[in-house]
Amino acid sequence: MIKNTVRIINKNSNTFINIRNNNNNNINSSLKSGFGTIKRFNTTLNHNSSNSNIQTPISINSTIINNNNNSNNNNSNNIINNDLNVVKFSTISTPNSILDTLNENHSNQTNNVNNKNYNNNNNNFEKDDKFGPPNNQNNNKLDLDTSKLYVSKSTGELFFTFMILKVCSINFISDNSQKFLNLFEKLGLSKPLNFFIKYSFFKQFCAGETIRETEIFTEKLNKLGIGTILDYAIEELAGSSEGFDSVAENICETIRVAAKNPTNSFSCVKFTGLVTPSVLEKMNTLVSNVTTNVSELPIESFNSPLDFYLNQSSSLMKQGSEPLLTSKDIKEIKEFFNRMDKIFQLCHQRGVPILVDAEQSYYQVAIHHLTMSYSIKYNKEKPIIYNTYQMYLVNGMNVLKQHFELSSSQKFNFKLGAKIVRGAYMVTESERSQRLSTENPVLPTIQDTHKSYNTALDFLLNQIKSDPNSIGLMIASHNEDSINLGTKLIKQYKIDPTNPNIQFGQLFGMADFLSFNLVDQHQRIFKYVPFGPVEEVLPYLIRRMHENKGFIGSNSDKELFYLKKEIKRRLF
C-alpha cells in the first residue's frame, strides 16, 4: 500500500508534523502553536497516487495562499495557510514488520532537525524525536480520554504539574540551574531556596525526604495499578565512609519496605553513591587492562571479585608500575564490597529485585563486572539483580549479547536481569572524548540510538518467547514508539503480559499519559519513586530538569497537550 506524506513546517515555532494520506485527496489536521491555540489548515493534493510503482521521494513546488486567498488556481498543489510551508512530499511503502515500521518512522524524520535535537538535548534519550501534539499521522499513536487518564488528580494538581513541566522546558532556566544554585549559596540564601524547591520541583519529581514519606505515594500508585521503584536519589557523594554507609543503609531500608509487596516493588542502587567516583574509575581501569568484554574474564574474577581487583593492582606493582591503588583506595574498595554484599544479600533474602544504575562509560566496565558477579551469585532461580544497558552507546548491543551468552553458559547458568535505557550522559561523554582525543562512545545520531534500543527490545523479548523465565526485562523508556513496539511484540510473540519478568519503567512526575495507557493494556508498569533530603537530591533534580528540557520539546509536548485538554475540559 502506498501512503502520501506531506511534511509541514511551522515557521513560528520550528516544529513539524507529517500528514499521511492513504490515497485520499483531502487532508485535514491541526498544528499546535502556544497554549490553547490550534492553527488549522487544509491541504488539497492532486498528485496521482495510484501508481504503486512510485517508491522514492517526489519534490513538488507549492503555492502558499495568504489570508486574502490570492493564489494561482492552476497550480497542482495548494496549501491554505499563512505560516505553513510544505517541505517534503513522498510516497512510502508500508513496511512488513513492526520493527521495520519503528525504524522507518525514526529514519524518515528530517536529519538536520533530529541531529540538532540530539546534540542540544543533552541528557534526554528516553524521549520521542517527534515534535508537536498528538495527531493522527500514525495509527499507533495514543488518543486518550483525559477524564479517565487524570481521574485521580485534582485540577490544582494538574495545573501544578503543567507549570513545573513548562518551566523545565525553558532553556535559560534549565541550562543555568546549577549557576543559580551556586549564586544563592554564595549569597547565603540556600535555606529559602531549598524551601522553594521543596514545594515546587522536588514536589513534582520526588516523593518525600524519607522512605516513610514515600509510602503515601506508593500506596496511591499501587491502587492505580502501578508498581514502584524506590530510589534513594543521591547522585554521588565524595564524602566520608560514614556517608557511604548511610546511603547503603537507606537503600537497605527501601528493600525492607519493598519486601512488604515484593511482586509490585523494586529497589535500585547507584555505585557512585557507595564509593568515591575516582576509586570506581581506578577499578574500571584495572578490569579494562584485562579486557573490556566482561564475559571474557576468568571464572575466578566473578567468584572472588574483590581478590581480582587487589591482585590486578599487585600485578602492576610487580611489573614496576606505580601502584594504581593506594592503601586508602584498598581500604575503601573493601568497604565498598561490604556495602554491596549487604544490599544484594538482603535483596535475595527478601525476594526484592534491584536495578543497578548505569553511569558514565569510564565506570561502566567495572559496573558490568560487579553486577555480573553478584548476578551469578544471586540470580540462579530468578532475576534479582538487574544490570542496566545504555543503548546510545556504540557497544551497547554487543555488551547486552555478551552478557546474555554469559548467563546462558553452562559454567554460570543464571537468570539475566536487564534494564534497557537510551542513556543520560551524552554531553559529559562527548566532552571527555574530545578532551582526551579518544573515540566518542556514543552513537552519532538519535536515529541510531532509536534503532539500537528497538533492536535490543526485540532481542530480549525473543529470548523470553523461547523461555519465559530466562530473562528479567525492565523496558525503561518514555519513548512512545518503543513502548508501542514492546506491547506489540509481547502480543506478536504470544507472551503473557502478566509475566513477572517483564515490566515497563518510567519516572515519577513524568509521562503519566503513557503509564496509565499501559495500565489499561494490562501491562506491568513501574514508576521510579525518588526520595532524599532536598539539599542532597538537588543534583538529581537538576538532571531531571535537563532531561525535561528535551522531553518537553518532544514526547512531553503530548503530556502538556493532555494536561491542557483536561484542565480546559474541567474549567470550560
UniProtKB/Swiss-Prot annotation:
Region (Disordered): 105-140
Major location (coarse): mitochondrion
Matching SUPFAM superfamilies: FAD-linked oxidoreductase
Single GO term (MF): proline dehydrogenase activity
Catalytic activity: L-proline + a quinone = (S)-1-pyrroline-5-carboxylate + a quinol + H(+)
EC number(s) given by UniProt: 1.5.5.2
UniProt-listed GO biological process terms: proline catabolic process to glutamate
UniProt cofactor(s): FAD
Enzyme type, top EC level: oxidoreductase
Cellular compartment(s): Mitochondrion matrix
Listed GO CC annotations: mitochondrial matrix; mitochondrion
Record function comment: Converts proline to delta-1-pyrroline-5-carboxylate.
Family from the record: Belongs to the proline oxidase family.
Protein name: Proline dehydrogenase 1, mitochondrial
Species: Dictyostelium discoideum (Social amoeba)
Gene encoding the protein: prodh
